[in-house]
């Protein structure tokens, strides 16, 4: 299969991508979060191609992307008032809402569940593609399953060239981590995955919000996952990742002491000079968490090489968007965290 490269700047791109989706093909689409691997979310055969291309477990549900917020009524029932409030405030945007699924949504799309995640992405090109296709687009992140997500079209081609019909190049993704997922079928609402819409922002609308245990710790492999990213290995390069927490000085002392040639250090820009001789790479500034979010998967993919035996990673602390970066890094590390403050 030849994978078509479709620049978002080309006026024919949206029509071409929409035609492929209508005909049951796979198109990688840009969003503000990460690139998605899209198919007609109502076509079971098309959706099955996503799982094959990614090597994705069948019980890992997909998110339906819509062109307009009101379209959630086409695919969900018993929609609570909170969903409309969230959509009004945050859509188009990096928020997925879990709702009871209508029968029109195939079980292959929902991972066998009675619920479905719906999102209206903040990318004009992709919304136009969805509108022209006339179908909701089921789209997980466009990386090989378990690997770091794709935030450029070149990342997508690295993983899927020759395996999918087309990739739409919309440039580098602005947010850089997958959407926030909130489950409105639970009372109180439950955060299943942090992202560009923060828990603090959600609480302003919802009042009360609980955080699923899978966000901060490994999930029981037998537990049903209601959203992507809740179980299975995610976001990981080939080398084991170890998060080193603690003060800047303590962490640097620990890493410099145990560092072996060939290993890499993934740190903040402000820390680069502390790791001279340890082959450091910065993924953003500690004092600007948006740069960490935008640069996270760029660096994890850069470190996804067979000749790197280990990656030491520094992780931001605190809430807001930093909470989402923590979640992705901890999952990439398999929750392997060493507190340098506790090392004598």
Residue ranges of model-derived segments:
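Active-site-adjacent structural elements in enzyme catalytic cores
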Residues: 1-344
